Amino acid sequence: MVLNLDTENRKMQDGNNDDDFDLEVKIPNSIFEKLKSIEALKARESQMCVSGKDDSIPTCDKNSTPGMITQRSCVYGGARVVLMPITDAVHLVHGPIGCAACTWDIRGSKSTGDKLYKNGFSTDLQEKDIVFGGEKKLYESILEVNKLYHPGAIFVYSTCVVGLIGDDLKAVCRQAQEATGCRVIPVQSEGFKSFNKTAGHKLACDAMLDYVIGTEEPEEEHPYSINIIGEFNVAGDLWGIIPLYEKMGVKVHTAITGDSTVAKVASAHRSKLNIVQCQKSSNYLAAQMEKKYGIPSIKVNFFGLDETTKSLRAVAEFFGDEEMIKRTEELIKSEIKNLRDEISEYKKDLSGRTVAIYSGAHKSWALVSAFGELDMEIIMSGTQNGKPEDYQQIRDHVCEGTLIVDDASSMELVQLLKEYKPDILISGAKEKYLSLKSGIPHCDFNHDRITAFSGYQGFINFARVVHTAVMTPIWRLSRK
């Protein structure tokens, strides 16, 4: 059996007993050795391609192939990670207790103020609730958490079970809001609504648009105020971005939703500009805010020195203030000057090393420039929930011969790591131990990390973590 990833002929062909891919860049025979017995392999063939042959991208945005155990999340999980960083809100899960395991530390967002968002709340539906309905239990739960915590808002998340039994989430939330005077927001996030958790991201954005944004006025308006959309303050990333804009003379009104409050998000419609971390859900929210409130938006990326510099200049150029532009250039010069020597030291060991990325759709291409600044080469990039536009971005950023993968299973990922032998894998915690057991260094760039990677200082942190992972002596000893 021969697997051919050539875009002119993606069909399964009969051949000898060894499995291989026919490519301009030949991939060794053993990549899918352990997958021979899986009938679903044919359906997975088109979800991998090699950049540079033409403008092709992997088949994506589809149901996971039956029998291939992937690591995707659900729609509820997608909604939860977007809204969870709102620090003074209660996040109440209407469903079985197991769904409440998706809590604040799934994304690890940090806060300078309220810590209420770190508490977990669930209606803990039981068998009798499934039979007789859970609306009464939900109503009583909302009243109880409001009495105990007096939150800025209560987000109520619907789960699969609730969608099946037909509880009227909106009606209960409306009644509870009238009874408590607290903002009670339904999030119709039944997990089975889509195979792709990004549908949950959009539902979370809709909840903010329908019930939060535009409902309050800011304490004061600033002529150069911005919102940062798609920044969730994982490991304190936001705190490496805000000071840079403040030095330029720009006021960051709020991030949506990292380290935010209900009041800040509610008054975000008065900001003069939205800057958008390039994720599909973030672009959707920015587009809706422009349509509804006339706020323009620009895309930014704070991973790496060059991308951070571009993001600062883009905002200064948007406002067109000559003094701001001058301050921005002075700031950029000062920041890079202070980091140049340290980066050079890391590059001595990292130059020429190879990297595999299996992460969120945005990071799978946004990190390419950052690794280029360390003279490292991307040889594989993939994501679990990428859309066509995400893979187009990956294709446009990586070098010819890079393998691009959609929705890889653990077995596939292990085989690809063994064949490509990258010097480091950049991914999340779910892939961490696959990498380490394969003898390949790992860097966590997803929600579980504890080190900030955004902005200028964040890039130094990133380079240090990558350098430490690659140069740890255990890898040299284990390979012997």
Swiss-Prot record:
NCBIfam families: nifE
Pfam families hit by this protein: Oxidored_nitro (PF00148)
GO MF assignments: nitrogenase activity
Keyword entries, A-Z: Nitrogen fixation
Functional description taken from the UniProt entry: This protein may play a role in the biosynthesis of the prosthetic group of nitrogenase (FeMo cofactor).
Family: Belongs to the NifD/NifK/NifE/NifN family.
PROSITE patterns, sorted: NITROGENASE_1_1, NITROGENASE_1_2
Organism this protein belongs to: Methanococcus maripaludis (strain DSM 14266 / JCM 13030 / NBRC 101832 / S2 / LL)
Pathway in which the depicted protein is active: Cofactor biosynthesis; Fe-Mo cofactor biosynthesis
CDD domains assigned to the protein according to its UniProt record, in alphabetical order: Nitrogenase_NifE_I
Gene Ontology biological process terms from the UniProt entry: nitrogen fixation; protein-containing complex assembly
Sections of the chain in a coiled coil: none
Name this protein carries in UniProt: Nitrogenase iron-molybdenum cofactor biosynthesis protein NifE
UniProt gene name: nifE
